[in-house]
Amino acid sequence: MPKSSSNNPCPPGEILREGYYRHGYERRGFKRSSGTYIPPTEVSEAYVPPTCIIDRGKPGKGPRILPKPGNDLHLSWYGYAVHEPERDRHRALVEASQENDPLEVLRRLNLLRNYQAYPDVKDIMSQDVKFMSDFYAKYKERNQEANRFGRSNSRSRSNSRSKSSRSRSNNRSKSSRSSSTQSKSNNRSNSRSNSKTSRRLKKLPENDLDLDQDGGNRYGGDPLTSITSDTTGNQILETNIKLSKETECSEGKCQVFNKVYESHTINGKKIVFETLDQNDSENVLSLDKLYLDSDQTIDRVRQNLSTNKGYIIGIKSDNKLEGYCWYKEISNNEVKIFWFCANKGYGTALYTFMEKYFKLNNYSRIVIDVSMEGSYAVRRINFWNHQGFKTYQVKTDNHKIHMEKDI
């Protein structure tokens, strides 16, 4: 038997239940099987004093079980990422609340915060949770005021209609009174349904939060899905960026190739963005066989890496290639993406890096022709729409969509 603690006056094996007030109530009357009727009785309110009861619980606290985040809402769709500035994070949360229930956004953010293991990032997300709590409080207060105003107007209209109905009912038959009652009930039900609809559609304007209306990075990651699907945060703990040029000479001709290397340590995993070469042929072939809707060989991969040297950048996780992007410069300020593929959880991260890299090279526009054929056609189109690309032309001859984005 466990020993009784100093602040527990009960004997070992028992705990003290706090005193409480029991509400009064009326016990219904009933008839016994013998035929005797027991009339109703009133049980008055009473105070139940503290008492010792058996401790049936196990010692210590139970395990903390958090619900799994679903796929109905991802904050990364609206540009939320913990490494973004506070203003951009708040703008993304407001945008998510404009298209979803603010309470759902708050719950999602709070759940991701509770999953967070790194104290620094958890502090950032805690600040955002407080921001969303204040946002939801304003939203709820404004909705309550609108509902009270709507109900008062509805009651005044209903009272005026009922008075006029009673004055007319003196000269009508019973059938007319019944039809009038049915009409009033329909009006009340319609007013209630309209009130519910207005509550669902009610949204809090952004300018109530003193946020500017321009721009905003929409390509940040959801803390659970940004880089890898099995990590619990998009925390950049270490950064190492190298930009260089490599000169290669052959048959008296020399060419200069760009080389890029950027590394991040995220949740113990080493995430690397770097220029690919022929040493990556096997890994590139594996991705091509998975995503390319045609046969691919190792010779073609090596030839493509050699021909387009310096224009193919990949993303690696612990030295495993998770995706790559092949691009070419088509003018002084335009760049075209010829091929882009990535495993689940790495596409947004790869594109975010590519856009940053293009900006560093003074490109102002990205062009891409998205194929409408193959098993991944819908996912491709949705992905580029989500990244902010606009459709300018549908090429029916080769079944491709021409999309562009200014950066």
From Swiss-Prot:
Ranges annotated as biased composition (Basic residues): 158-175
Gene Ontology MF annotations: acyltransferase activity, transferring groups other than amino-acyl groups
Domain (N-acetyltransferase): residue spans on this chain: 271-407
Gene Ontology CC, one term: virion component
Compartments where found: Virion
Skewed-composition ranges (Low complexity): 176-196
Enzyme Commission (EC) number: 2.3.1.-
Organism, scientific name: Acanthamoeba polyphaga mimivirus
Assigned keywords, A-Z: Acyltransferase, Transferase, Virion
Main location: virion
Stretch list, region Disordered: 145-231
Superkingdom field: Viruses
Protein name: Uncharacterized N-acetyltransferase R584
